[in-house]
């Protein structure tokens, strides 16, 4: 599905070439500029097709059309979605636990991507599924989905620049004495596709945690990610001796205690790439985590 953006050229870009405007104002990547050049409607000024080397003048209207296709390898599946926010560019969804973000081997039709593609199809929209902040299968809560490649790239830049803020609530084993930060590099474990470990040759990973309440053998924490490595919170908390309750991979699996790792994405904040508005979303703790806490109280 096409996304059309228009911009009236101000005096600061009077006499500039289109490439300059695309990169400085729209912050469009070189790869996306190449895509825009492939079709006539990609770049227009005052309704006429233009090249990126052409110059613009104050008062000109620059229009770009971002063309999208459809994720043909993702089967649209009628899965109920808890949509927290939606506009022309972004979806914010409250993902339940026991639902992977993407399809995988042996699970082709029951992921969030399948549900989102069905939702797009029901609205007559052809789009590619583009998750911005991916959540693990058994992690619940807020996550964002970009509706086109431009928004996906811009929000990805916000993550790289640490401008997109994410906070989580989790329940860990043991009595965590005080707030703290784990700054420990993470990499994939040798011989494993899934398992991650702390290792000197890993990628830098930083997790901040705050004690919300202690329950003797367990502690409720608020987590804030400075980086976004796979399984980062789970790996870091296990590394300091406080694995997440119910984490079968990095802690102890006991379905009598918890059926999944007690981790919920409760806060998401980013700057909207089109409007410049600060988008802030909050969600309370997941119901199963709340029930677990109530049993401890």
Put a short name on every predicted segment.
Residues 1-297:
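RNA pseudouridine synthases
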């Amino acid at each position: 599905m096409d996304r059309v953006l228009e911009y009236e050229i101000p005096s600061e870009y009077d006499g500039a070439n289109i490439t300059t405007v695309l990169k400085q104002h729209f912050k469009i990547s070189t790869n996306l500029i190449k895509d825009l050049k492939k079709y006539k409607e990609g770049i227009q000024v005052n309704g006429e097709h233009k090249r990126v080397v052409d110059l613009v003048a104050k008062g000109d209207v620059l229009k770009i059309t971002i063309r999208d296709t459809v994720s043909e390898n993702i089967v649209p599946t009628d899965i109920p979605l808890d949509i927290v926010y939606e506009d022309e560019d972004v979806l914010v969804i409250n993902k339940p636990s026991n639902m992977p973000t993407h399809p995988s081997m042996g699970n082709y039709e029951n992921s969030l991507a399948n549900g989102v593609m069905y939702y797009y199809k029901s609205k007559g929209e052809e789009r590619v599924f583009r998750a911005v902040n991916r959540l693990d299968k058994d992690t619940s809560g807020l996550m964002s989905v970009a509706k086109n490649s431009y928004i996906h790239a811009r929000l990805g830049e916000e993550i790289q620049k640490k401008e997109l803020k994410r906070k989580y609530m989790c329940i860990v084993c043991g009595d965590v004495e005080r707030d703290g930060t784990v700054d420990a590099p993470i990499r994939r474990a040798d011989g494993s596709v899934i398992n991650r470990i702390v290792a000197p040759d890993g990628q830098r990973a930083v997790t901040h945690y705050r004690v919300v309440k202690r329950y003797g053998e367990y502690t409720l924490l608020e987590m804030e990610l400075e980086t976004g490595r796979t399984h980062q919170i789970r790996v870091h908390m296990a590394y300091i001796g406080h694995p997440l309750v119910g984490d079968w991979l990095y802690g102890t699996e006991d379905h009598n205690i918890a059926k999944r790792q007690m981790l919920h994405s409760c806060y998401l904040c980013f700057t909207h790439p089109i409007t410049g508005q600060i988008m802030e979303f909050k969600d309370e703790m997941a119901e199963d985590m709340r029930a677990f806490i109530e049993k401890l109280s």
